[in-house]
Amino acid sequence: MASLKELKDRIGSVKSTQKITKAKQMVAAAKLRRAQANAEAARPYAERLADVMASLAGKVSGDSAPRLLAGSGNDQKHLLVVVNTDKGLCGGLNSNIVKEAKAQAKKLIAAGKDVQFYLVGKKGRAPIKRDYEKQIAKHFDTSTVKQPGFEEADAIANELIDMFEAGEFDVAHLVYPTFKSALVQDPTTNQLIPVPSPEGEGTGGDAVVEYEPGEEEILEELLPRYVKTQLFGALLEREASEQGASMTAMDNATRNAGDLINKLTIQYNRSRQAAITTELIEIIAGAEAL
């Protein structure tokens, strides 16, 4: 059985840890409000851009379609762009993203496809490297930036487009967390490159719209911007998901610390009471012996 001093020291240690987790919970809650607002504000822009893309793509024939829309003509080499966080202490967020990425990789490999990874964020590297060390093409470090934004999305998009133009992959899939709430962040996989062709969208109500200088020229400009917007949205969703998961994890840790403190306090009081009782018995026994 632990001594009273050991129990007292342990209670003090858990209380110190509880203060840290409580502080981290409050910081995450404050950051979450801003991150959630940024993620939600970016969604309408991405949706509207997708509508415009659908309208333009419906007016372009296959031969004149830009490469980013038409694709390479092959479907053999696939690249999984996996967006993880740079920091830990956010529950099972990163493990869920990695699990989704590995599931997509297994599905593609089972279909006879070649799979490579492009990793964004530090926390996904080690678990993916364990199973797919030779299939990691590149990684992009966002840990040096306090708040990754459009500049980072632009850099990632440019590198991916260059890789696509060089024939390093035929199809790129974006794997990232979608923020639902502080309790729910769903791993999502969307095709990024070539830009998915619309299915029955943008050809009806927009049929009378004429574009200048022309659909092909506008698409050449908008397609890279669409890729950058998708990556920017993924980074914003990642930030909101990270803060939500971190707030929830730290709240659980604070509650668990409180439960442990209560148990240790009861154990301490019982041990102290037993020690006092033992001392009293010894004193009484000594007095009777005299």
From Swiss-Prot:
GO molecular function: ATP binding; proton-transporting ATP synthase activity, rotational mechanism
Membrane topology: Peripheral membrane protein
Subcellular localization(s) per the UniProt record: Cell inner membrane
Alphabetized UniProt keyword annotations: ATP synthesis, Cell inner membrane, Cell membrane, CF(1), Hydrogen ion transport, Ion transport, Membrane, Transport
Gene Ontology CC, one term: plasma membrane
InterPro entries for this protein: ATP_synth_F1_ATPase_gsu, ATP_synth_F1_gsu, ATP_synth_F1_gsu_CS
Primary location: membrane
Endpoints of the signal sequence: none
GO biological process: proton motive force-driven plasma membrane ATP synthesis
UniProt record similarity statement: Belongs to the ATPase gamma chain family.
Described function: Produces ATP from ADP in the presence of a proton gradient across the membrane. The gamma chain is believed to be important in regulating ATPase activity and the flow of protons through the CF(0) complex.
Oligomeric form and interacting partners: F-type ATPases have 2 components, CF(1) - the catalytic core - and CF(0) - the membrane proton channel. CF(1) has five subunits: alpha(3), beta(3), gamma(1), delta(1), epsilon(1). CF(0) has three main subunits: a, b and c.
Name by which UniProt lists this protein: ATP synthase gamma chain
